[in-house]
Amino acid sequence: MPATGKICNFDCIYCENGFNADRRTPDAFVTLPTLREALEAKLVEMSSTGELPDVITLAGNGEPTASPVFPEVVDASIHLRDEYAPEARVAVLSNGTYADRPDVHRALLRVDDNLLKLDTVDPDYIRFVDRPAKGYDIEHQIEVFASFCGHVIIQSLFLTGTWQGHDVDNTGDTYVMPWLDALRRIGPRSVAVYTIARDTPAAGLRKATPQSLDSIAKRVRALGIDCSASY
């Protein structure tokens, strides 16, 4: 992703990188040679100090899989990991909207940790809080996530509060029960539930309580799916 702004097809009201309109950039995605050189330089530096990374994460201020060279970036990251930090894992944090593209799907199958976003399955909530680009279809996303046959970690953010006079609490049964049904269909390796940890561009948002997150995580584990909760 470019360092000068944000490129994303979601415009989440809780995004720590701000609203898309406030972070527009004339710059394109980082090129493959630039990324490869930067990653190798960092790994060489870390290797010299004996402090190698546990995880190499492809994320950034936007949607990494939107990059036209995303599959090549994955291959380069795996190659450099194997050369300099063979014990490290390669992870991708994604909203999953490009995971139905064959080249992106294959690339996500190659990484160790394929983390895909699913905050809720309620279309109105998604439109109001996650604000994806036109054409987003939650049923299609669930089917795509299930197509990884377990090679997927679902990341779900829970929060409370209000925005523009509307309640944005997705910790209650109205949202959690259908979300649990979606997890059954997806069959992920694990689930990570968490809440906001930094300032958000939208005012009025609040953290989900540890008690709420623990309760949600317990219900996921009852499905036979490993689940972590971060406060």
Model-derived features: positions:
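Short acidic, glycine/proline-enriched helix-loop-strand junctions
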Residues: 152, 160, 202-231
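Conserved AdoMet/S-adenosylmethionine-binding subsite of the radical SAM
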Residues: 66-194, 199-206
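Local cysteine-cluster metal-coordination motifs and their immediate loop/turn environment
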Residues: 3-19
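A generic structural signal for well-ordered alpha-helical segments enriched in polar/charged residues
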Residues: 41-44, 79, 181, 185, ...
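Conserved Radical SAM active-site core
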Residues: 14-110
